[in-house]
């Protein structure tokens, strides 16, 4: 939302924008101590809470299909395990030269959805 906007989500967009800016700022400030700072951004993630929310909507299967149709990679929600795998990568030595980054673990939702809409 901080990168794309969607309407009626000003507070959420502001919080996401702050996360993005602070990630970059803290990466610069903590660089001299050898501390890397990165953030993870997710879109729709299938969790028990999300499942409960969607199951309390009228036509839950239809709503889930509508949401998942907007996720370009495999038309499905991200799993908690996929997010955890991304975090494990950022915490590992495999990302030893990565700092100040916002990593989107969202099946291409933020950066590909709008581009593919016209394809």
Which stretches of residues belong to each language-model region?
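Proline-glycine-enriched beta-turn/loop adjacent to the NAD(P) cofactor-binding site
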Residues: 38, 42-48, 101, 108
